[in-house]
A protein has these predicted regions:
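OB-fold and OB-like single-stranded nucleic-acid-recognition modules
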Residues: 1-129
Length: 129
């Protein structure tokens, strides 16, 4: 199901490969719960903030001038593994988003309970659209 506003998620696999933008948008706007209990895999670059670790991408809506970062706050069993990954290094993470965790108060940044993380090569196009 796609929740009306979103394309349906492929249910033929146990893990849904999604863009970080899609995870953020669904967490903020999709009231039908299409991500609830779903294992999701995303690719992004690591951001070590003062009080948190994030996986992020840069989203371009129209042109580079309107580029904005989109990110997931990393929690869960694999959080400690992020110490092995420097800021700006690229990773693939698998886990579940915490329902209703992206709020105006936290800048619409969902919490992502990460089960696994692995280093990957940067994509040929690092942006999301």
């Amino acid at each position: 199901a796609g929740g009306g506003l979103f394309q349906p998620i492929d249910t033929s696999s146990e893990v849904a490969d999604l863009q970080i933008t899609d995870v953020v948008m669904r967490t903020v706007w999709d009231r039908s719960g299409t991500l609830d209990g779903r294992t999701v895999r995303v690719t992004g670059f690591v951001v070590h903030d003062v009080d948190a670790v994030h996986v992020a991408r840069v989203r371009i809506m129209c042109c580079a001038a309107d580029a904005v970062p989109v990110k997931l706050r990393i929690e869960g069993p694999a959080l400690a593994e992020f110490a092995d990954h420097e800021t700006d290094s690229w990773v693939e993470v698998t886990g579940e988003v915490v329902p209703d965790s992206a709020t105006a108060a936290n800048g619409h940044v969902p919490t992502f309970v990460t089960e696994s993380v692995r280093a990957v090569e940067p994509p040929s196009d690092p942006y999301e659209y």
